[in-house]
């Protein structure tokens, strides 16, 4: 079922194309696509299933709600979807969420900010399948610097740096 996420692309997709991409047989592919449409994900027009931006993420969240494993779902997502999933998880826990917050002088970007009870969680999403100790150390240093800049530019704020990875 998780492999069906690979077939969710913006624009129209036929059952045959979906089946080819996901390596799911034609009958099951059609059942899966019809199930998506029945649950409000995408539309069916002239034998093509149309998905909008965000449908893949919504389906991934639905999979999580049905108990499918987060690590397997995350692998099927690209980095934008992974950031969106991180933001959705925070939002579901009553955090106010800001995505892609830009800081200036120096220019820095924070992927996801979650704020609750006066504390900001500043998240750098790394869609890494594997990583080295040096790349992780570098990411940690950069995220600490982003956090220092955020606190310096946001009077009275308290912030925690976080890095979210797949593995």
Regions found by a protein language model. Name each.
Residues 114-124:
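Active-site beta-strand-loop-beta-strand hairpin of nuclease catalytic cores
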Residues 111:
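Cell-envelope/extracellular polymer assembly enzymes that use nucleotide-activated donors
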Residues 68, 124-125:
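Short beta-strands and strand-loop turn motifs
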Residues 87-106:
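A short acidic/basic microdomain associated with nuclease active sites
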Residues 3-81:
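Interdomain/boundary linker segments immediately adjacent to catalytic/signaling cores
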Residues 125-167:
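Catalytic cores of nucleic-acid endonucleases
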Residues 3-6, 34, 88, 141, ...:
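Surface-exposed alpha-helical segments enriched in charged/polar residues
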């Amino acid at each position: 079922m998780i492999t069906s996420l690979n077939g969710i692309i913006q624009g129209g997709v036929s059952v045959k194309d979906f089946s080819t991409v996901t390596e799911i047989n034609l009958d099951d592919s059609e059942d899966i696509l019809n199930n998506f449409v029945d649950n409000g994900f995408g539309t069916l027009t002239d034998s093509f299933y149309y998905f909008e931006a965000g449908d893949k993420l919504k389906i991934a969240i639905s999979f999580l709600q049905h108990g499918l494993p987060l690590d397997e779902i995350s692998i099927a997502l690209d980095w934008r979807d992974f950031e969106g999933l991180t933001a959705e998880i925070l939002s579901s826990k009553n955090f106010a969420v800001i995505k892609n917050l830009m800081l200036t002088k120096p220019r820095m970007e924070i992927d996801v900010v979650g704020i609750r009870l006066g504390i900001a969680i500043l998240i750098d999403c790394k869609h890494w399948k594997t990583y080295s100790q040096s790349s992780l150390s570098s990411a940690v240093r950069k995220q600490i610097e982003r956090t220092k800049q955020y606190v310096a530019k946001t009077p009275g704020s308290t912030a925690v740096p976080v890095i979210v990875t797949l593995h």
